[in-house]
Amino acid sequence: MTPNEYQEQTHSFACYEKPISYENIGCQMITHELDWTYPALGLAEEAGEVVGKFAKAVRDESGNISGERREAIKKELGDVCWFVAELSTLLGFKLEDVLQHNIDKLTDRKNRNVIKGSGDNR
């Protein structure tokens, strides 16, 4: 399965309510429906769950990742992927383009010897 095929398939599972538009209550800062709210917050939550699995491995198993914990991490990584794909869809990006852009950025940083640096635009 390609990333774009994954994106198309996973979007069919997007069953969440979109918040009301602030436009109709007079807010000048935001004038569109916040379609991205749930997926953005969900991405943070799922990424936290991945980190939590590693934290418990450190706490409970001296950092070893057991087979059961490994499978639990795989499930959470899948959830992270769903939210990344959904946000990409809502923002009008093809997932393959997002992934290629990331490779291009990392390649450029590596070629300029700044991959270990700090900052988004290094």
Which residue ranges define each predicted feature?
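Flexible "arm" and connector segments at domain edges
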Residues: 1-122
